[in-house]
Amino acid sequence: MKTPNAQEAEGQQTRAAAGRATGSANMTKKKVSQKKQRGRPSSQPRRNIVGCRISHGWKEGDEPITQWKGTVLDQVPINPSLYLVKYDGIDCVYGLELHRDERVLSLKILSDRVASSHISDANLANTIIGKAVEHMFEGEHGSKDEWRGMVLAQAPIMKAWFYITYEKDPVLYMYQLLDDYKEGDLRIMPESSESPPTEREPGGVVDGLIGKHVEYTKEDGSKRIGMVIHQVEAKPSVYFIKFDDDFHIYVYDLVKKS
């Protein structure tokens, strides 16, 4: 496997860099500082685009328009204008207000709904979800890079893919991890005796923090504002956060044990 990055699809160019809470650890993901968004009036309800293939242009400042294609994975219940999108050739999951963001141009629905893929080994899938892992990637000149992270969940729509995040870069990625596991590139780390596995409570997770606004102070003293948009069922102390100035989805443990 290649080191996680944001490989550009055909006709795509790197978007402008935005402020980050953490270093990118030699990653080349696309970043941007978001500007104010305003809704566009609509006389009728918009169609459900979750599961659809989409394409659109992207216009950032004075940069030339670039073209993007991807799959809409989910619509965020706490903020229905926000969609999670897996773009072709990009390892990260992006969060964008597709109908409101003025940088999104000529949004087109390419297909009504993609056929849901199936996992080859349901038992193995259940085994890796919620686990701390070591994920091996091929670095420069054939070297091996080891990334420690956590498998968060099976991705929606694209069921053969899994959400994962890393200690080096706590944003939301997705990969076909069962293939990596079978090829020896994904290894489940032994559970620490000091931190017993979290048991899932019956009836799902408590979502008391979902929808809450959070403030993050960066190393330079500047602050960024975001919203908690999702709680990870397999690890209830772990949440997804969408910051106003970035379209990446950040993954943080908000209930750190002292």
Swiss-Prot record:
Similarity comment: Belongs to the SPIN/STSY family.
Known role: Involved in the regulation of cell cycle progression, this activity is related to the inhibition of apoptosis following the removal of essential growth factors. Exhibits H3K4me3-binding activity.
Subunit annotation: Interacts with C11orf84/SPINDOC.
Superkingdom field: Eukaryota
Species annotation: Homo sapiens (Human)
Gene name, Swiss-Prot/TrEMBL: SPIN2B
Name listed for the protein in its UniProt record: Spindlin-2B
Region (Tudor-like domain 3): 210-255
Tissue expr: Detected in all the examined tissues with highest expression in liver, followed by heart, stomach, kidney, skeletal muscle, placenta, and pancreas.
Region (Disordered): 1-49
Positions of region (Histone H3K4me3 and H3R8me2a binding): 138, 246-248
Listed Low complexity bias regions: 1-23
UniProt region (Tudor-like domain 2), positions on chain: 129-178
UniProt biased composition (Basic residues): 28-39
GO biological process: apoptotic process; gamete generation; regulation of DNA-templated transcription
Note from the entry: Overexpression in murine myeloid cell line 32Dcl3 causes G2/M arrest.
Location of region: Tudor-like domain 1: 50-99
